[in-house]
Amino acid sequence: MIAKKILYWYDNNKRSLPWRVNCTSIKKEYLTIVSEFMLQQTQVATVIPYFNNFLRHIPNMASLAKVKEEKLLKYWQGLGYYSRAKNLKKSAKMIVDNHNGRLPNNFLELKKLPGVGDY
C-alpha cells in the first residue's frame, strides 16, 4: 500500500531531468551511469549543463569506452573530482568488453565497476 502511494506521489511530483527521458533500455543505462557518476558529491542543478554537454560529445557507452582521456577530461572540466570521470571511462570499458555494452544485471557485478559501491 505504501509503495503505491510513493509511486503515485512520484508520478505527480517528479522533476524533469535530462536522464529521465523515454528511450531504449540501452540508452537509459548509459544516461543513468553517466548521471550517477556526475552526481557523486555534486548537486543536480550543477550537473545538468555538464551532463547535456557530455552527451553531445560522448553519446553512448561504446564512445565513452574509447574516448581519449584528454577529451574525456575536457568534457568533464568544471565538475571537479576528475577521478569520477576516469572511473566512469574504466567502467564503460568493462561494460563494453565484459557485458556486451549493457550494465551488469546483478549487484555483485555492478560493484566490480570502478567507482561503484555502497551508497
Residue positions per predicted region:
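N-terminal polyanion-binding entry modules of DNA glycosylases/AP lyases
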Residues: 1-113, 119
